[in-house]
Amino acid sequence: MWSTRVKKLLLLSFNFLIISAIVSSCSIPEELQAKTIVNEFFPNFWVFVAHTIALSIIILLGIFLLWKPTKRFLAKRSELIQAEINNANEIKKQAQFLLDNAKKQKQNAELQAREIINLATNQAYRLKNDLETDAKRKANRIIENAHAEIIKQESILKRELEGRIVDVALEATSTLIQKNVAKEDHERLVNELLRNLD
């Protein structure tokens, strides 16, 4: 785009130079005559050759001093821009690669977090069940021990009660023997003893 624009500008400036050189070499006299118009308006051959050589030199200088350095500069600039574009594309690929890796790592981390949460939840449920089972076992053991203690205490109380009953019966028998009590008195005495036991 720049090269065509530069070429057009160079051609336009060279055309302007040619026209100005031709016009400047001609002088219009004060008196215009047919002979003088042709001779004065159009330059003679040597002037034309000198102007053509000068124009050629100017064109060559323009090509070598303006157009070629500009073309080289634009080519270098184009290469630099292309290198920057390639570099940017490479950086973009690397960034995309890193982004993909980061996404994979994030997914792996989320998966590991879910697994850890599930494992912790399962361990918590297992621990809860173990604690409940242990607590039930201890409670059952305490209840069994309490039942055993109750049975033991009952048997002790029964033995004591039986011992008392025997003592009371012996006492009653000895009292009956001593008193020769009537049947009604005997029943009343037994009922009294039973009330005392309660």
Swiss-Prot record:
**Subcellular localization, per the record?**
Cell membrane
> InterPro entries given for it?
ATP_synth_B-like_membr_sf, ATP_synth_b/b'su_bac/chlpt, ATP_synthase_B_chain
Membrane topology, record value: Single-pass membrane protein
Q: Where is the signal peptide?
A: 1-25
Lipid-linked residues (S-diacylglycerol cysteine):
26
Q: What GO CC terms are in its UniProt record? A: plasma membrane; proton-transporting ATP synthase complex
Keywords, A to Z?
ATP synthesis, Cell membrane, CF(0), Hydrogen ion transport, Ion transport, Lipoprotein, Membrane, Palmitate, Signal, Transmembrane, Transmembrane helix, Transport
User: From what superkingdom does this record's organism come?
Assistant: Bacteria
Where does the chain cross the membrane?
Answer: 45-65
Report the CDD domains cross-referenced here: ATP-synt_Fo_b
Lipidation sites (N-palmitoyl cysteine): 26
Function description? F(1)F(0) ATP synthase produces ATP from ADP in the presence of a proton or sodium gradient. F-type ATPases consist of two structural domains, F(1) containing the extramembraneous catalytic core and F(0) containing the membrane proton channel, linked together by a central stalk and a peripheral stalk. During catalysis, ATP synthesis in the catalytic domain of F(1) is coupled via a rotary mechanism of the central stalk subunits to proton translocation.
The entry sums up its family as follows: Belongs to the ATPase B chain family.
Return the NCBIfam families for the record: PRK06231.1-2
Under the subunit heading, UniProt states: F-type ATPases have 2 components, F(1) - the catalytic core - and F(0) - the membrane proton channel. F(1) has five subunits: alpha(3), beta(3), gamma(1), delta(1), epsilon(1). F(0) has three main subunits: a(1), b(2) and c(10-14). The alpha and beta chains form an alternating ring which encloses part of the gamma chain. F(1) is attached to F(0) by a central stalk formed by the gamma and epsilon chains, while a peripheral stalk is formed by the delta and b chains.
UniProt protein name = ATP synthase subunit b
- Gene name linked to the record: atpF
